[in-house]
Amino acid sequence: MSFEKEFTKEVLDTFENVKLLLNGMMSDRSVPRNIKRVSQKCIEELSRKDESPAVLSSNVMYMIGDLSQDPNIPFHSRTTIYRIISLLEKIKD
C-alpha cells in the first residue's frame, strides 16, 4: 500500500527541514555517537514512503523524544531536538 499521494509539498518540506537539522547534529563533533546513530535512523525513517506522513513523524518524534532526556547531549542539540519535535507535531492525518 502506497501513501505517496498523501505527501503534500508542505509535508515534504517539513521532512526536508528535519533531515537538515538531523544532518547538522550528525556533523557536530560534540554530539555523542549514540545520538548520531538515532539521528541516522530518523533520517532513514523519514525517507520511507510505505507509511502515512503522520505515522512517520510520530515514529521520529518517539525516537528522538528520549534523546532530549539524555544527560550527555549538549544543550544546543537538545534545543535542536525540541525544534524538530515542534516541526513534526504539525503533521497529522
Tell me what each language-model feature is.
Residues 66-93:
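Amphipathic alpha-helical binding modules
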Residues 16, 44-47, 82, 86-89:
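Generic structural signal for well-ordered, non-transmembrane alpha-helical segments
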Residues 11, 51-54, 93:
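Flexible loop/turn segments at the boundaries of HEAT repeats in alpha-solenoid HEAT proteins
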Residues 8, 29, 50, 70-71:
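Short, charged/polar micro-motifs that form catalytic or ligand-binding hotspots
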Residues 20-62:
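Amphipathic alpha-helical interaction modules
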Residues 1-31:
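Short terminal alpha-helical segments
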Residues 11-14, 56, 77, 84:
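Amphipathic alpha-helix face/heptad-repeat signature
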Residues 17, 59, 80:
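Charged catalytic carboxylate motif
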